[in-house]
Amino acid sequence: MNVRGYEIYSYKSFPYDLYKGSPYYQKQKKKKDPVRYRCMLMAFDIETTRLPEIDQSVMYVWQAAVNTSVCVGRSWKEFKRFLNRLTEGMPDNGRIICFVHNLSYEFQFLRSVIKFDDESVFMPSGRKILRAVAGKIEFRCSYLQTNMSLDEFTHKYGVDYAKVHGFDYDALRFPWTPLTDEEMEYIVGDVIGLTQALAAEMHADGDTLNTLPLTSTGYVRRELKANMKEYPLYLLKKMQPPLYIFQMLNEAFRGGNCHANRYYSGDILENVHSVDRSSSYPAVEVIEEHYPMGPWKLET
């Protein structure tokens, strides 16, 4: 089957030999982690049907894009066989990065199907899953990496296969339900569009899979580190307050408070608008030319 110029394979017909010779990125300097990532852009997604009588969802189709090849299956057994064939012959420290837009959702299904390394499951907050490793596959959340919906992400980079709309989510579908060409176009569209957008993002930022930040804030940290290189480390260390002052600052800190104007307290007001300054503290530090910087001195 062919969708918009992309050949759609089953796990049996997928061209595994085409990717067996894929090279690996060189290990980054100063990194002790022996893992080497394969030069292969992969995305994964599932479609589910909600069963209200048992208040659960079931997967009726999965799809994975590997560079320009797309594999579609209807059962978890097929998915496991697909991963086994895809990683066959890889070295012990070899790994394939597989992006999932909103990994936290897919992880609820995957964790009962494949074995994850418990220590590899990285949750930055709450129940959000940023990264999880199963065998030689490293699943990463592209939603947390971009901080954008898939629709926003694909349109931002103007990819050929932007998110397709008009899909009927309410229709009951099962692994044995025949899928129309229009449904297949939607189903494979998300993984194709995701790989295209990720490739465009990396090209725009000069990244590879080896250097791509895990989260959207990773770009800011990277830029900050690059700009801070011009400041000698010993000067930065001199600016750090002594421990007892640091503890006092922590105890004195407050922020994010919302207060009522005492003249209007208890009244219901209409047509009210509000204005908020985002990231006010770091903005002041950057914008103000004479923001105080230097060693802490005790005045007696």
What are these model-derived regions, one by one?
Residues 45-49, 102-104, 108, 143, ...:
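Anionic group-transfer/hydrolysis microenvironments
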Residues 38-40, 91-96, 269-271:
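Short coil/turn segments at beta-strand junctions that form active-site/ligand-binding loops
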Residues 4-7, 60-69, 98:
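Cross-family signature of deubiquitinases and ubiquitin-like deconjugating cysteine proteases
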Residues 31-63, 272, 279:
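Gly/Thr-rich phosphate-binding beta-strand-loop-beta motif of the actin/hexokinase/Hsp70
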Residues 57-61, 112-119, 285-298:
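Short secondary-structure boundary/capping segments
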Residues 68-179, 185-193:
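Conserved DEDDh/DEDDy metal-dependent 3′-5′ exonuclease domain
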Residues 5-17, 21, 52, 172-174, ...:
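Common nucleic-acid-contacting/processivity interface regions adjacent to the catalytic cores
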Residues 1-42, 46:
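N-terminal accessory regions of nucleic-acid-interacting proteins
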